[in-house]
């Protein structure tokens, strides 16, 4: 039950960042930090920075992360910052993933870059 609650709170915080409720999302992130949910905390922080348009800070913070599931978020930062070479390199790394969701993301980003 506790895990399920943590997941729900993380989802609420992410929705909050999308609705510019950054203080509230940060409070949830602090609580999740106390519960040892560091990946969720980092995702909430990245989302908050990105939703405020601070892609450079999000990328800088995210590049310090050890969670591979955050890589697509960093690719989005590179895309928004116009860092074509870094984005291409990241997409090439992500393309080696066996995760079909990552493959879908990579294919979608590559299509986006063609337009």
From Swiss-Prot:
One of its GO terms (cellular component) is cytoplasm. Belongs to the YscG family. Chaperone of the type III secretion system (T3SS), also called injectisome, which is used to inject bacterial effector proteins into eukaryotic host cells. Along with YscE, prevents premature polymerization of the YscF/SctF needle protein within the cytoplasm. Required for Yop secretion. It holds the Pfam family Type_III_YscG. Component of the heterodimeric YscE-YscG chaperone. The YscE-YscG chaperone forms a stable ternary complex with YscF/SctF. Induction: At 37 degrees Celsius in the absence of calcium. Belongs to an operon involved in the translocation of Yop proteins across the bacterial membranes or in the specific control of this function. It is found in: Cytoplasm. This is Type 3 secretion system chaperone YscG. Disruption phenotype: The yscFG double mutant is unable to secrete the Yop proteins upon thermal induction in a Ca(2+)-deprived medium. NCBIfam families: type_III_yscG (TIGR02508). Keywords: Cytoplasm, Plasmid, Virulence.
């Amino acid at each position: 039950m506790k895990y399920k609650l943590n997941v729900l709170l993380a989802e609420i915080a992410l929705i909050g960042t999308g609705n510019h409720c950054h203080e509230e999302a940060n409070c949830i992130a602090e609580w999740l930090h106390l519960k040892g949910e560091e990946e969720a905390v980092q995702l909430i922080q990245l989302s908050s920075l990105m939703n405020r348009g601070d892609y450079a800070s999000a990328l800088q913070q995210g590049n310090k992360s050890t969670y591979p599931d955050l890589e697509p978020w960093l690719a989005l930062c590179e895309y928004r910052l116009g860092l074509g070479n870094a984005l291409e390199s990241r997409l090439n790394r992500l393309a080696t993933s066996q995760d079909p969701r990552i493959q879908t993301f990579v294919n979608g980003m590559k299509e986006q870059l063609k337009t």
